[in-house]
Amino acid sequence: MRMDERKQKVLAAVIQDYILTGEPVGSRTIARRYNLGVSPATIRNEMADLEEMGLLEQPHTSAGRIPSDQGYRYYVDCLMPPAHLTPEEEEYVRRRYNQKMLEIEQVLAETTRLISEMTSYAAIALGPDQGRASLEEVQVLPIQVANKALLVAVTSTGVVEHRVLTIPEGVTPEDLNRISRVLNARLQGRALEDLRQMVLSDIYQELAQHRNLVNLVRDLLQQLLSLESGERVYRNGTLNILNQPEFKDLDRVREILSFLDQDEALRRIFMTTPSTGLTIRIGQENKIEGIDKCSVVTISYAVEGKIMGKVGLLGPTRMQYSRAISVLRCVADALSQTLEQLYR
């Protein structure tokens, strides 16, 4: 059966109405609201054809139609009108990123808050791969607690790690400063993934005259080697799914919330999408268990042309796709610009 212009108009009207109301759509509703220039009977016949083509579904015998995953896909690829944020919204995004944020964790956490706020969907983000990062700086600092010190490690991707550790009796601030110098001299510029295999003998030898520091060095190195080597996952607005009528079923809600709570599950979303550009996965196009009734939209962000990670959102298949896409594009651009400033 051929998809002609009238069928396209009917399909677009059904999808737009269903996205707006969440209720199955009948032919009379389309005739009344969308001024297609044909009778309800003609629209009804077109809707029956669209159902036969797999683009619409009829959830109940006497109800109207709703879009299928295939129908949404056709709409997104062929029929969806372009959408843009208003100048006021674009300025709002810029202002949010103009806040003083010194660490990449702050920037990505703010990014997920912003996406969730502007779309009312669950927002997710994948940070830079720390396995490919290197150690930029390490400091061991005294703190106002007996026998404690603060280890601060900064990576080349802007991630800052903090660790509090116990130090031996008699270790002075001058000793901690010496340890910092030795660690920086030996470890600065090393890839994090290489730290586990590095030879420690040089460091132990250099600090050998300070016997009470040897054990501290060992503990410090253990802390450094425990730095996360994978991409960190950020999320916000996961409870937004409770506001969607599709997710009123408690078992389905539990399944989705459980999925959103698992870092590794969210990483799989990003790892199964192309590394660059915008990707839209609708319903069963998501081959990951737990989200086959959802749509996922992701987009990459970059620093000086190098892809660093991805941001995205998860919501019902009855998603305002054009709005979601325009928000993600604007946010990804602002995020990339912010990170370029941060890395300088």
Curated annotation (Swiss-Prot):
It holds the Pfam family HrcA. The keyword Cytoplasm does not apply. GO terms for molecular function: DNA binding. GO terms for biological process: negative regulation of DNA-templated transcription. It comes from the Bacteria. InterPro entries: GAF-like_dom_sf (IPR029016), HrcA (IPR002571), HrcA_C (IPR021153), WH-like_DNA-bd_sf (IPR036388), WH_DNA-bd_sf (IPR036390), WHTH_transcript_rep_HrcA_IDD (IPR023120). Gene3D superfamilies: 3.30.450.40, Heat-inducible transcription repressor hrca homolog, domain 3, Winged helix-like DNA-binding domain superfamily/Winged helix DNA-binding domain. Keywords: Repressor, Stress response, Transcription, Transcription regulation. The keyword Transcription regulation applies. Disulfide bonds: none annotated. Negative regulator of class I heat shock genes (grpE-dnaK-dnaJ and groELS operons). Prevents heat-shock induction of these operons. HAMAP family: HrcA. NCBIfam families: hrcA (TIGR00331). Belongs to the HrcA family. This is Heat-inducible transcription repressor HrcA. It comes from Moorella thermoacetica (strain ATCC 39073 / JCM 9320). The lineage of its organism: Bacteria, Bacillati, Bacillota, Clostridia, Moorellales.
